[in-house]
From Swiss-Prot:
<keyword id="KW-0472">Membrane</keyword>
<feature type="transmembrane region" description="Helical; Name=3">
    <location>
        <begin position="94"/>
        <end position="113"/>
    </location>
</feature>
<keyword id="KW-0297">G-protein coupled receptor</keyword>
<feature type="transmembrane region" description="Helical; Name=1">
    <location>
        <begin position="19"/>
        <end position="42"/>
    </location>
</feature>
<feature type="topological domain" description="Cytoplasmic">
    <location>
        <begin position="283"/>
        <end position="305"/>
    </location>
</feature>
<protein>
    <recommendedName>
        <fullName>Olfactory receptor 4F4</fullName>
    </recommendedName>
</protein>
<feature type="transmembrane region" description="Helical; Name=2">
    <location>
        <begin position="51"/>
        <end position="72"/>
    </location>
</feature>
<feature type="transmembrane region" description="Helical; Name=5">
    <location>
        <begin position="189"/>
        <end position="212"/>
    </location>
</feature>
<dbReference type="GO" id="GO:0005886">
    <property type="term" value="C:plasma membrane"/>
</dbReference>
<feature type="topological domain" description="Extracellular">
    <location>
        <begin position="152"/>
        <end position="188"/>
    </location>
</feature>
<feature type="transmembrane region" description="Helical; Name=4">
    <location>
        <begin position="133"/>
        <end position="151"/>
    </location>
</feature>
<feature type="disulfide bond">
    <location>
        <begin position="90"/>
        <end position="182"/>
    </location>
</feature>
<dbReference type="InterPro" id="IPR000725">
    <property type="entry name" value="Olfact_rcpt"/>
</dbReference>
<dbReference type="InterPro" id="IPR050427">
    <property type="entry name" value="Olfactory_Receptors"/>
</dbReference>
<feature type="topological domain" description="Extracellular">
    <location>
        <begin position="252"/>
        <end position="262"/>
    </location>
</feature>
<dbReference type="GO" id="GO:0004984">
    <property type="term" value="F:olfactory receptor activity"/>
</dbReference>
<keyword id="KW-1133">Transmembrane helix</keyword>
């Protein structure tokens, strides 16, 4: 009976592991700083108390949480001889990954819907995207994330693990773990693709259709409004591609390639949460202005103190 799993990690080279430790330590620091900066800015600046920025702040919290499930252990494991995780710890990682990942999908869809209403039906925006609607969206996001993660965990919790325990990655995820089970997992592989893969692909297609409709609507707007809307949409579409691109290949692609899987796993858990705050702050004038106001307020408070 397997009681622990051994991660093979990203590399066997000690020199490369030292470099990767420094690189990902800086990256994770950037993830924490960037996403917390967005949350603090949105909460503290009344100019950003709108549905779009409410959803953005929640997206930043989920990005930070999603990265924190895997990145800290990956970083500490670079200096470990045996990169080990307990069986229960592995199940917890699977649960949290799909909990935050499922919730993020819903929030990205909600952000697409928010932009659709704001641009295509502006007169109804305040009625549809009211405070209660935003709270309801978050409740649905967490609820779907929970149901999705429980369904994923149900696939793995009763599987017999009696022999191989080496996971060729730096964290536990269902497609990799079920391959170590002492039973035929073909049907289970199909169920995982049907669950995570179909959910990912359908969500991605829905978002692409929504943003296509929005882009077609923008063409008929005045130049000043269309340029601002296009800037915001570019940020949204970039984030959607960064999130769903790796997900489609990890969960929906039936012919996994080990080296590509590791790269996509790093991209999904580290690079995307790092880039999202940069994209939203660099492409959004309101966010940049609010951050400057926050810095001035902080400097003023320090001088006063």
């Amino acid at each position: 009976m397997v009681t622990e799993f051994i991660f093979l990690g990203l590399s066997d080279s000690q020199e490369l592991q030292t470099f990767l430790f420094m690189l990902f330590f800086v990256f994770y620091g950037g993830i924490v700083f960037g996403n917390l900066l967005i949350v603090i800015t949105v909460v503290s600046d009344s100019h950003l108390h709108s549905p779009m920025y409410f959803l953005l702040a929640n997206l930043s919290l989920i990005d930070l949480s999603l990265s924190s499930v895997t990145a800290p252990k990956m970083i500490t494991d670079f200096f470990s001889q045996r990169k080990v995780i307990s069986f229960k710890g592995c199940l917890v990682q699977i649960f949290l990954l799909h909990f935050f990942g499922g919730s993020e999908m819903v929030i990205l869809i909600a952000m697409g819907f928010d932009r659709y209403i704001a641009i295509c039906k502006p007169l109804h925006y305040t009625t549809i995207m009211c405070g209660n609607a935003c709270v309801g969206i978050m409740a649905v996001a967490w609820g779907i994330g929970f149901l999705h993660s429980v369904s994923q965990l149900a696939f793995a919790v009763h599987l017999p693990f009696c022999g191989p325990n080496e996971v060729d990655s730096f964290y536990c995820d269902l497609p990799r773990v079920i391959k170590l089970a002492c039973t035929d997992t073909y049907r289970l592989d199909i169920m995982v693709i049907a669950n995570s893969g179909v959910l990912t692909v359908c969500s991605f297609v829905l978002l692409i259709i929504s943003y296509t409709i929005i882009l077609m609507t923008i063409q008929h707007c005045p130049l000043d409004k269309s340029s601002k809307a296009l800037s915001t949409l570019t940020a949204h579409i970039t984030v959607v591609l960064l999130f769903f691109g790796p997900c489609v290949f990890i969960y929906a692609w039936p012919f996994p390639i080990k080296s590509l899987d590791k790269f996509l796993a790093v991209f999904y858990s580290v690079i995307t949460p790092l880039l999202n705050p940069i994209i939203y702050t660099l492409r959004n004038k309101d966010m940049k202005t609010a951050i400057r106001r926050l810095r001035k307020w902080d400097a003023h408070s320090s001088v006063k103190f």
